[in-house]
Curated annotation (Swiss-Prot):
Gene: cmpA
Region (Disordered): 31-52
Descriptive protein name: Bicarbonate-binding protein CmpA
PTM comment, free text: Predicted to be exported by the Tat system. The position of the signal peptide cleavage has not been experimentally proven.
Induction comment from the UniProt entry of this chain: By carbon dioxide-limited conditions, probably via CmpR.
Ranges annotated as biased composition (Polar residues): 35-44
Any one GO cellular component localisation term in the record: plasma membrane
Gene Ontology biological-process annotations: cellular response to sulfate starvation; monoatomic ion transport
Family the UniProt entry places it in: Belongs to the CmpA/NrtA family.
Length: 452
């Protein structure tokens, strides 16, 4: 299994086994025992006027999703007929029980009863391509679009209120690092899947405040149900989580929000659409048709007047199966932070899907892939498979298919929104650190806490 050993593989599967389902359980709805395989039936809508040269090779594909706000473009493209508009009338959007299940299902593909692709934390497509998290089984994948920016945050248990454990934890670093001296255990934090987005966000937050997430605290992959219960009873201290969890955690007095990822890295890359390379290579026109449908869905979602309908659709029984009240505030960019912090009421700090304050959200910048793999190197993840930045760049060039995104956007008439470069340029984090994709080694050198 390379750097992802069998024990960690099994622990990860167990740790994420109830991740998506707990959202339903906490809302008062019993978890669906068939959640890993439930999904929508192929759309019955007829395709619009499509020229022969753009007619998809197939109308059928099975896309997996996790019931969190990152999945909205897939769901809306299906429900509002954007997939069907471009000839993809046989799309099945299939709920996955957790990230481990999605990983396993894409490995076997839809013909084996799995999925062809769908929604992914980064850099899962790269890791699956290299066989790093699939027991050495290399399944080439293509990253095709970014689904969303923002929509995540760091939750903290109420026992730490008033201790300075907020966005900037510099002054609370000694309190966190010395927690074992007064409490008989280290400060404990959790995420739902290792070495990907939510792990990276909480690691960056700790390290920016002078806390080493590998030595000063216990950082674990833990199911949300267990994590939230731990926050209630005082055995879990922090949690890297995504919408609608920030809303729930504060309103249900489970804890408070130390900060949003929108504050840690404004307009950061989040989750992506990625599909098996063999499917894309066989069906390039269908791939672009999917992309066009998702692009239209992203634009539709980002119109504030459509957000109430977005909430109605994604909260429905076929998808998230939660009360609409749980999703209304996050989709407005409204967050009650707790611990005496001012509330946030800013549409630009909530989940965005097509445009943000920098440019296009949907376009899969190679520079963002590079940050995810550079961060992997920073923390010493997958040393054998990704030993250096040159290897990382080669993997990105193999996996990232921004060229297909450009072609699809051009064919759909979205030329004004096509970025001029595969790099978004220099990125700036809340602690003043910058990441220049033209010089990622300088970023690594600038970091005080790292494993390289």
């Amino acid at each position: 299994m390379g750097s992802f050993n069998r024990r960690k593989f099994l622990l990860t599967s167990a740790a994420t086994a109830t991740g998506a389902l707990f959202l339903k359980g906490c809302a008062g709805n019993p978890p669906d025992p068939n959640a890993a395989s439930t999904g929508t039936n192929p759309s019955p809508q007829a395709a619009g006027d499509i020229s022969p040269e753009m007619m998809p090779e197939t109308a059928n594909i099975k896309l997996g999703y996790i019931p969190i706000v990152e999945a909205a473009p897939l769901i809306i493209a299906q429900e509002k007929g954007f997939f069907a508009k471009y000839g993809m009338t046989g799309v099945e959007v299939s709920k996955q029980a957790n990230w481990a299940s999605a990983r396993d299902n894409v490995t076997i593909g839809s013909q084996g009863g799995g999925i062809d692709g769908g929604q992914w934390q980064m850099p899962m497509p790269h890791l699956i391509t290299e066989g790093i998290i699939t027991n050495g089984n290399k399944v080439p994948m293509y990253v095709l679009a970014q689904l969303i920016t923002q929509g995540n945050g760091i939750a903290v248990a109420p026992m730490h209120e008033g201790k300075g454990v907020n966005l900037d934890i510099t002054k609370a670093a000694d309190y966190i690092k010395g927690f074992n001296k007064t409490n008989g255990r280290k400060f404990k934090a959790a995420h739902t899947f290792p070495n990907v987005n939510q792990d990276f966000w909480i690691r960056y937050w700790f390290a920016a405040g002078g806390v080493d997430p590998d030595t000063d605290i216990d950082l674990l992959a833990v199911p949300p149900a267990e994590t939230v219960q731990g926050m209630r009873n005082g055995t879990m201290d922090a949690f890297s989580t995504g919408d609608p969890w920030p809303y729930r955690i504060v309103t249900e007095n489970i804890g408070y929000m130390a900060g949003l990822t929108a504050q840690i890295w404004p307009y950061h890359p989040e989750e992506y659409l990625a599909i098996r390379a063999d499917w894309v290579d066989k069906n390039p026109k269908a791939t672009k048709a999917l992309l066009k449908g998702i692009m239209e869905a992203q634009q539709w979602i980002d119109d504030p007047k459509n957000r109430p309908e977005v909430v109605q659709i994604v909260s429905g029984r076929n998808y998230f199966n939660v009360p609409t009240t749980i999703l209304e505030s996050p989709f407005k960019g409204q967050y009650t932070m707790g611990d005496g912090q001012p509330a946030i009421d800013d549409f630009q700090k909530g989940p965005l899907y097509w445009k943000d304050g920098i440019g296009n959200v949907s376009y899969p910048y190679k520079s963002h892939d590079l940050w995810f793999l550079t961060e992997s190197i920073r923390w010493g993840f997958h040393k054998n498979a990704i030993p250096d930045l040159d290897t990382a760049q080669k993997i990105i060039d193999k996996v990232n298919r921004e060229d297909l995104w450009r072609e699809a956007a051009t064919e759909a008439g979205f030329t004004a929104d096509i970025p001029s470069s595969t790099s978004r340029g220099v990125e700036t984090f809340f602690d003043g650190i910058t990441f220049d994709p033209a010089n990622p080694s300088a970023y690594l050198q600038s970091l005080a806490i790292k494993k390289v």
